[in-house]
Amino acid sequence: MAGDGWTTLPLDQAVLVNPSVHLERGDVYPFVDMQAVDPESRSVGPSEERPFKGGGSRFVHGDTLMARITPCLENGKIARYAATEGEGAGHGSTEFIVIRGRPNVTDNGFAYYLTKWDGVRRYCISQMTGSSGRQRVPTSALSHCEVTIPSLPEQRAIAHILGTLDDKIELNRRMNQTLEEM
C-alpha cells in the first residue's frame, strides 16, 4: 500500500537504465564478468583490468548491475558496482542491465533495492525472450514494469535501513566463514 507522496511510474522512468558512461576505446578499465556477481552479496568489485573495446555494459561506482540472461537473473545476480578507486568507471559483460537512481526521482541506494525487489525481478523474468536456455530480458520491458516509489527522503531512509541490515548479514557471513576455517 502506497503512503502519502508515493508515486507509481514505469521502472524506466523511476531509474536510469543503461546510463551513458564515457570510456576511451583501448584504455584499460576495471572489468566485471557475470561470474563475479554473487547473489548473496550486495556489491561486486572488478574481476580484472581489461582494455575497453567499445561494447558491453558501462557503469560507475554505486550503479546496480542486473543480469539480463537466464539462468543468472533467476539466480538473483543483481549487485552494486563497488569501484576500487573512488568514482571510477568500469565495464562488463554485455549481459548486464545497468540501473542508476534518476536525479530528483530516485536515490541510487533505493534504486538497487527496488531492482532487487522480488516483484521487479519476477516481472523481468516473465518478460524474457529468445530461445530456450539463452533467454534475455529486453531493456524495453522495463518501460512496462510499474513501480511505486516514496519521496526521496523516505527512499534514503529505506535504503539506509536495508543497507544496515545487509551490513549485519555480511558481517555474520564473514564470521561464520572464519569459524568454519578454524
Q: Where do the model's predicted regions map?
A:
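Short, positively charged
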Residues: 109-139
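A short glycine-rich beta-alpha junction/loop motif
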Residues: 89-97, 129-159
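Sequence-specific dsDNA recognition surfaces
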Residues: 8-67, 72-74, 80-81
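Non-catalytic DNA-recognition/assembly elements of restriction-modification systems
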Residues: 1-22, 148, 152-159, 163-182
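Active-site donor-binding loop signature of nucleotide-sugar glycosyltransferases
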Residues: 34, 101, 147
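A short beta-sheet element
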Residues: 55-57, 61-117
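Residues that recognize and position ribonucleotide moieties
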Residues: 4, 30, 89-90, 113, ...
